[in-house]
Amino acid sequence: MNRRGNLKLITASIALGFGLAAGVTGSALAQSKDTIKVGILHSLSGTMAISETVLKDTVLMAIDEINAKGGVMGKKLEPVVVDPASNWPLFAEKTKQLLTQDKVAVIFGCWTSVSRKSVLPVVEELNGLLFYPVQYEGEELSKNVFYTGAAPTQQAIPAVDSLMSKEGGGAKRWVLLGTDYVYPRTTNKILRAYLKSKGVADKDIDEKYTPFGHSDYQTIVADVKKFSAGGKTAVVSTINGDSNVPFYKELGNAGLKAKDVPVVAFSVGEEELRGVDTKPLVGHLAAWNYFMSLKNPANDEFTKKWAAYAKAKKLPGADKPLTNDPMEATYIGINMWKQAVEKAKSTDTDKVIAAMAGQTFKAPSGITSKMDEKNHHLHKSVFIGEVKADGQFNVVWKTPGPVKAKPWSPYIEGNATKPDEPVKK
């Protein structure tokens, strides 16, 4: 070996020695660079792309906005986008890739609970950080996840209360209709127990499930119509993904109007109604913690930003830019994460987790959104909106103020003794 080769080898050995002596890890090396990498884990293909693609774009918009203001701790955010393609095991693989190969500081992603459940053991094992922006069934609390969507106490229970009330139509019979996976089944388990606690008999509750991507709702809608002949009926829909389009089309075909059998949906917002003739659906309901139609300065700013971004990036649907609840939850999440990193003066997972407690952000829903000091969930207002002919929602009911999440439902046996904060591992 020549002298130059020896010199290179010695230099490399010294550098490696210093690195090992200092305990340099992949995370620390990633921090030492000029950018902070941010993972975006949303389905851009498959049955969930109808809902998730726009969340990827929301993160990218927020990153552009943060970078334009100087970044985080003087460093630009660098997005790393992957497509888990509505394939639940692939979510876990992509998460591992983001954390071990791409060395991201945080991941924003998932929609379905089955995708989140796939990701959970990976972020826990590798001590990663996931911000999850969609309503879910609860019954989970991880130190490595911040849940910026709603727990059942912030969506499902208030929606049922509203439909049971005299003002909401006084429903006596209930069809619990969902996609066949953990979120609908667990939510409906909670709702069945809740309805029974309110005196509703088993014979007045019907549960139905369809697979992801299901497209033929003729028989199910006919069954709902028949069931509703037994008394004032409401449908609670936890159908997810592109199946919502044929379901709502079939409601229209069958002439099942909201005044006869109102449907309240937990996974249908402005984006999902884009491909549907909404005129037959006028008056049907959705329960969320945000609607595009809310009038307040923070939402005016949010919707204008999104419209400008969609136009500039030539996004699909830019001619009719829409915002929805999971977009708002995503936007709150990345801004709170930024604030927490700056408070912690580090992207270290444990330091950021500690700094997230009690973070606040002026949310497009019109409230100052707060991350609970203990349970990793946002305090959220609840709104029920009626579908309008233009595909927007008219808010007909809301909670007096923000509602605290209860991750462990009091309507599931054994939950009373579970702590309202993640168990340290």
Q: Which role fits each region the language model picked out?
A:
Residues 50-57, 69-140, 148, 209-218, ...:
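Beta-alpha junction/loop-to-helix N-cap segments that form part of ligand/metal-binding clefts
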Residues 98-110, 131-133, 173-178, 230-241, ...:
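Periplasmic-binding protein-like
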Residues 90-93, 137, 144-254, 297, ...:
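Extracellular/periplasmic Venus flytrap/periplasmic-binding protein
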